[in-house]
Amino acid sequence: MDGVGIAKCLDCVRKTAEEAGSLIYANWRLPKIVNELKQHDIKLKLDVETQQLITRRLLDAYPDFALFGEEGQTGDAKAAYRWVVDPIDGTVNFAFDIPHACVSIALQERTDSGSY
């Protein structure tokens, strides 16, 4: 994986996660706009907005990578690398103002067998 410059990837991810976290924090105590509600899951408008921000930042920096996120996929499904994103990991907690949520971003490398 170091062929992509893992230190550079890590720096990009850190900055992106901090920016996404700032967006989430700015909306912490504001009314939440719910897009979808299920028994054990909730989808907020802010989930979509946060993933859009993350997608822009990561794919601007790494346009040949794919992105697989909780709110949808972008890029070539057969790319050598893909970002895996949960824009608000702990959305239910966040929706109810419980301070246990974060931005989760991982990077996967496609194996020789074609899986991640």
Predicted regions and their residues:
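DPxDG-like acidic metal-binding loop motif
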Residues: 77-116
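N-terminal subdomain of lithium-sensitive/metallo-dependent phosphomonoesterases centered on the IMPase/IPPase/PAP
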Residues: 1-88
